[in-house]
């Protein structure tokens, strides 16, 4: 069911509002998809949504990965019998703020795109290559945990740890066309680049092969921070 019908929720009709299509107009289309088409299917039909909880694509996404039309008819708030006006009102209110990259993704999803080769290795960058990338305007994404980042990091780098909802956060603080140099725990570099790619950010140029050695050789570019628990 893609991003139309989730388990416990339905898709957001507000993500293309800034390109001339209102949330109400898309809500009417969603009503037709959910109430008139999907809810017309037998209860036993199995439901496999595009994804589950862990994103801002809805306000009540389940952690389950599959369901049935019957279960959604019984328990999904948006699948209950209601008028078109009621449906549009209920699915447009109370939505979390959409990350900035959502509109970019919604537009990108309508275009023909090359399939990403997940086996293609992320390049390990030498010190000279890192310096050249930074001089050309690349930004540094430091994917280490916050304590390691605080102990030493490149001035101007942005710390978004690889654990948790990294992709959603980097989508808020990076722009899609920015060249990105990654500093990450050993063995995690490929995963970081893949998570960038999942939101359409395809410009990870490589990773710093040995961060500690790079920091020692570029001490003037390294800064430290203290942490405060509140």
Q: Where are the model-predicted features located?
A:
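Generic structural signal for well-ordered alpha-helical scaffold segments
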Residues: 35-38, 131, 171
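General beta-strand structural signal in soluble alpha/beta enzymes
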Residues: 49, 141-142
């Amino acid at each position: 069911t893609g991003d139309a019908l989730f388990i416990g929720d339905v898709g957001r009709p507000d993500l293309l509002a800034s390109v001339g299509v209102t949330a109400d107009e898309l809500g009417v289309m969603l009503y037709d998809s959910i109430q008139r088409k999907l809810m017309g299917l037998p209860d036993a039909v199995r439901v496999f949504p595009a994804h589950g909880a862990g994103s801002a694509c809805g306000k009540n996404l389940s952690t389950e990965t599959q369901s049935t039309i019957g279960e959604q008819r019984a328990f999904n708030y948006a699948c209950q019998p209601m008028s078109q006006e009621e449906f549009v009102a209920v699915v447009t209110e109370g939505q979390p703020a959409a990350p900035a990259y959502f509109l970019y993704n919604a537009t990108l999803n309508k275009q023909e795109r090359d399939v990403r080769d997940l086996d293609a290795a992320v390049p390990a960058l030498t010190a000279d290559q890192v310096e050249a990338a930074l001089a050309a305007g690349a930004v540094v994404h430091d994917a280490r945990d916050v304590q390691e980042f605080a102990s030493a990091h490149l001035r101007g780098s942005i710390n978004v740890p690889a654990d948790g909802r990294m992709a959603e956060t980097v989508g808020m603080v990076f722009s899609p066309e920015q060249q990105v140099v990654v500093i990450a725990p050993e063995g995690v570099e490929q995963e970081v680049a893949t998570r960038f790619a999942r939101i359409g950010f395809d410009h990870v140029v490589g990773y710093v092969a040995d961060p500690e050695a790079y920091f020692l050789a570029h001490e003037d570019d390294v800064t430290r921070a203290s942490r405060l628990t509140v």
